[in-house]
Amino acid sequence: SMNISKPQKKLLVIQNFKYPSTDLDKYCYLYDSEKYKYAIVCIDTKYFVKIKLKKNPTGYDKVYAHMVKVLRNAVEIAQSKYNSTEFIVFLDMIGSGMKQIDVTFAKTLIVILETTFTDNLKYCIVKNAPRLFKIVYRLIYPFIDKVTRKKFMFEKKGKLNRITMNNIE
């Protein structure tokens, strides 16, 4: 066997350890449908894996990059198919739990999306929102610009309601 000193051996083990990570293609993807006259991006939050950023500061970089890529594709589809620059985001929270809530991730994502896709969001439609979404929304609300806030909708039994700080109670 190779002659490796104990500290070195420990280092090798750490390097080989893979952090559990979000299955990107299941978490965020283009929804191809003629039903809506818009490019649609789906985000299934149950596939989001929360990580400890202290241990792994760049841990979400791949997630952000993937989401930007998918949304860029959505803009391209909107332009070529619908002569538009807007997309709709479906945020489906079915099967999501408290353990997955990461406000830092949400805040960072908002900043990235607002700077990269300033005028491209038509609506963000939240489906199957658990009660804890309301807590998270209150926390991230101050970071969402006033125009974008108006684009958040709850979907309940096929009806859309705008999310306001009044109906978030």
Name these PLM-found stretches:
Residues 1-119, 123-127, 131-169:
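SEC14/CRAL-TRIO lipid-binding/transfer domains and related phosphoinositide-recognition modules
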